[in-house]
A protein has these predicted regions:
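Compositionally biased terminal segments of proteins
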Residues: 1-168
Length: 168
């Protein structure tokens, strides 16, 4: 498990090797850990631009293999394409010399978790709902659902479960 301090220390080391600024948007459990909603995460998930991803991947070392690190590109997270403003909506966590670290907005975390919706996702959603407006969530979901790479009916079904369990 990786806590917030370990994650920030790791990123500070990466920051020293960069020459240009890049924005890392933490997603999933990584975002929740940075937001203080979970004590730790089992893996590291970031979304960044395609150009920044190539730079970040080149900085990866053998030591980085101690963690499972997933990099997503241009708002395409797991199986959904988030709206273009996902990075603007994300909360800034820390600004280093070259890395701007953000955490995906709670509304967008719920939308990404709706695709899989397992027991761990439901626990995470329970921690997020107090920070999310139901109407905003529904509008955001309708923007994203058409981009879903899986079966849209299943994604809609999971979303309805979330609305019933957490927003009624």
């Amino acid at each position: 498990m990786i806590d917030k301090n370990e994650l920030l220390a790791w990123l500070a080391e990466k920051d020293k090797r960069l020459e240009k600024e890049m924005t890392l948007v933490a997603v999933g459990g990584t975002a929740m850990t940075l937001l203080g909603l979970k004590s730790s995460t089992i893996d590291v998930d970031f979304c960044l631009s395609a150009v920044e991803r190539k730079i970040f991947e080149k900085m990866m070392t053998k030591q980085d293999k101690k963690w499972k690190i997933d990099l997503f590109t241009d708002g395409y997270i797991f199986s959904e394409q988030l709206p273009y403003d996902y990075a603007d909506k994300a909360k800034e966590i820390k600004r280093l010399d070259h890395i701007v670290l953000k955490a995906l907005a709670p509304v967008d975390i719920i939308i990404t978790k709706a695709a899989r919706l397992n027991a761990r996702d439901e626990e995470d959603i329970a921690a997020l709902v107090k920070f999310v407006n139901k109407d905003e969530l529904i509008k955001r979901f309708e923007k994203v659902v058409k981009t879903y790479a899986g079966r849209e009916e299943e994604y809609r079904y999971h979303f309805q479960i979330i609305l019933k369990r957490f927003f009624n």
